[in-house]
Amino acid sequence: MNMIGRAVLVAALALGLLGCEKTKTDNNKTGTPSPVIAKADQYAIDVLGTYYLWNDEIKKDLVRLSPDTCRMPMEVVKSIRYHEGGKEVDKWTMLTDDLLSFKKSIQGQGLTYGYDLQLGKFSDRAGEYFLVVSYVCKDGPAMNAGLKRGDVIITLDGKPITKDNVYNAFNTYSVALGVTNVEGDHISGKVRTVRLKAVDMYEDPILVTETFEFGGRKVGYLVYNGFDLKSSEVLPEVFKEFKSKNIDELIIDLRYNGGGYAFTENILASMIAPQTNVLAGDVFQTEVYNSILADVWKQQGED
């Protein structure tokens, strides 16, 4: 599954610095980077040059991370990660100065408003955008404030949404949302203010589990938003419930799933894979390495 491969790349290669000193952008605009920044530069070069899947493709850009000159390694890593033309293929590899928060984030834990939003652009308002609520997390600030799927947000802190403030909907400790509804093809003129305060919470990726009848058949429906480790312990119970209800069909909705651990993916697959494929030993998952690691694999084998 492609999404797993992408997410594992993040988990394995997110360039979290060793040690306790944070690697902040060097405010010195001239001269050489500070020792901590220089260490981050070299670490990024070593990891990207050796372990990164597209190491050959970005090799020429690693010079931008020179410990002698690079004062913004986090920004440079983000800018040089693999593109195909103007398309950003790798959206996940990152250098971070907050490894604890990163580890929490890949476990679904972090400071959040407890919602997922999709961005849209007004056709008749130059430079202005709107946000549509895709879903809200159980017991999160958004749900507790009455937000629901389909709500439309047209202002942030009383101002129209633009490229300059759109991230306030995610990256602030509090926000005032101007929320409206869609009536037909038009946004309703009625706007209500919803105030949210971010909380540190676990966003359960098992968003919906239900059973319904369709065409004379019983269907199990699971909305699953991330292959984290914690949810791997709950998935077997979900499928036991489906089995107890004698479902005929199963829908697993992964539209908002950003990836996660292959371990959890394998648990899910073990509960739904057709027996014929299992007995035939069909390939379910493959791992792809760059040329350096592929050569090591060939020489040393799985051990």
Predicted regions, residues:
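Solvent-exposed loop/turn segments at secondary-structure junctions
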Residues: 51, 121-123, 139-141, 159-161, ...
